[in-house]
Amino acid sequence: MSAPLANDTFLRALRRQPTDYTPLWLMRQAGRYLPEYNATRARAGSFLGLAKSPAYATEVTLQPLDRYALDAAILFSDILTVPDAMGLGLSFAQGEGPRFAKPVRTEADVAALSVPDMSSLQYVFDAVAEIRRALVQDGRQRVPLIGFSGSPWTLACYMVEGGGSDDFRTVKSMLYARPDLMHRILEINAQAVIDYLNAQIDAGAQAVQVFDTWGGALADGIYQQFSLAYMARVVEGIRAGADGQRVPVILFTKGGGLWLEAMAETGADALGVDWTVNLQLARQRTAGRVALQGNLDPTVLFAEPDAIRAQVRRVLEDYAAGGGSDGHIFNLGHGISQFTPPEAVSVLVDEVHSFSRALRTKARSHG
């Protein structure tokens, strides 16, 4: 029997249930802005050494929770574990982004592609189970654990480009010239992501997020066909957790503000939004069908404490103006910068919690 949750605020917000305050976690909360993360990474020898060791992955997942009163933990891993398991030869050169030795570019490459055997990703599922155990303190689990994956389209971008890209020329050329090949890659990726997230859930993930980092690079109409349709498949394929309820699913398309209505129709429980989106309008557009997660500009954290507090309040007030504070998970609009001063995050966390409590008290007194 798993330990009861000491703090289930995040899961309640995902299900649009009342909460005493607005919960928060941060994309890339276990990362290079923390000196303790850098020390662990140095011991691991490399990024992949860190990500592929359940013990190290557990250590770095817990580091931000020991420093800040965050309301969720997120598995420390990388979105490219899935294409790596497909045999594409992932590497990370020092100071450079990811590289695949065998990019998927020809008809033969696509024909050779298949959904990986999840046993090759056992190190991820072992990490999930180990993190769940490590989160238990005095017989109770401190906060819920989020699992995640890249979206089928975002994974395809790296697989076809062979790494990161400024303009996605290679992958978009394939999409327009050979949509049949692109759909084949996306079908395989969607099934792989479903299997991967369900295995994380079986190991103990209590919510999952699909990171569609590059969906916003697509034209309107193309996004719906080549990214959103496959994320909808993923949402449909997610199964129930230990309590019999389907584990909540968060979809996050960076630059996806244009498509919130369509994203809400996938059946996802929550949508992540970046800082270009007004949360009050986002609530109106999604008509209360989903929780919303976001959406502070990460660079606000380079400002003085008073400016950070003012921007936190603006985000919370924008959301509350749409009809109360419930159903909101505070986050950044994208991953936290490695150059962020750790003390700025303390200011952020304290302000989110204290001001969101104050907003609820004020709403009750006016109610």
Swiss-Prot record:
GO terms for cellular component: cytosol. SUPFAM superfamilies: UROD/MetE-like (SSF51726). It comes from the Bacteria. Transmembrane segments: none annotated. GO terms for molecular function: uroporphyrinogen decarboxylase activity. Its main location: cytoplasm. Its EC number is 4.1.1.37. It is found in: Cytoplasm. The keyword Cytoplasm applies. The record marks D78 as: Transition state stabilizer. Keywords: Cytoplasm, Decarboxylase, Lyase, Porphyrin biosynthesis. InterPro entries: UROD/MetE-like_sf, Uroporphyrinogen_deCO2ase_HemE, Uroporphyrinogen_deCOase. Substrate binds at R28, Q29, A30, G31, R32, D78, Y158, T213, H334. Pathway: Porphyrin-containing compound metabolism; protoporphyrin-IX biosynthesis; coproporphyrinogen-III from 5-aminolevulinate: step 4/4. GO terms for biological process: protoporphyrinogen IX biosynthetic process from glutamate. The keyword Cytoplasm applies. It catalyses: uroporphyrinogen III + 4 H(+) = coproporphyrinogen III + 4 CO2. CDD domains: URO-D (cd00717). NCBIfam families: hemE. Catalyzes the decarboxylation of four acetate groups of uroporphyrinogen-III to yield coproporphyrinogen-III. Belongs to the uroporphyrinogen decarboxylase family. PANTHER family: METHYLTETRAHYDROFOLATE:HOMOCYSTEINE METHYLTRANSFERASE RELATED (PTHR21091), UROPORPHYRINOGEN DECARBOXYLASE (PTHR21091:SF169). Homodimer. This is Uroporphyrinogen decarboxylase.
